[in-house]
């Protein structure tokens, strides 16, 4: 089922795509692919250009996921490629007893997560087997992560998402690999 939860967030900020395309693209991409400080909070040419928590920004997405996947305080959610885990944080604000887990390859991203979710986050690659039981999570989400994988890695990641989740929501912005 094709659903769109995130586009409104992307349209809420201005972006200069042309400026980013005429930059030293190869070197910028190599720096961004490290997924550390420069990607998250460094110059915009490498990634987000300052990915800060804005109270309530992810709340509409969290509400839609909770509603559409029938989540409650007894549910469990895994976020594959959670970054700074702002969506998991907003979900915890709405459902304080929601069991969450999230992983990312970025030490900087995970270190920037809010305290109430940070204990449930760990370093892991989306394309490696997940350390969870079959159907352990009521919902597995992945937003803005999988398009960074090579095709052979993507196949493993999608199989793992299907294996550990009863339901899944995957967002792909683009796929250029």
Where are these regions (language model features)?
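Class I (Rossmann-like) S-adenosyl-L-methionine-dependent methyltransferase catalytic domain
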Residues: 1-69, 74-80, 84-133, 149-163, ...
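A conserved beta-strand element that flanks and buttresses the S-adenosyl-L-methionine
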Residues: 141
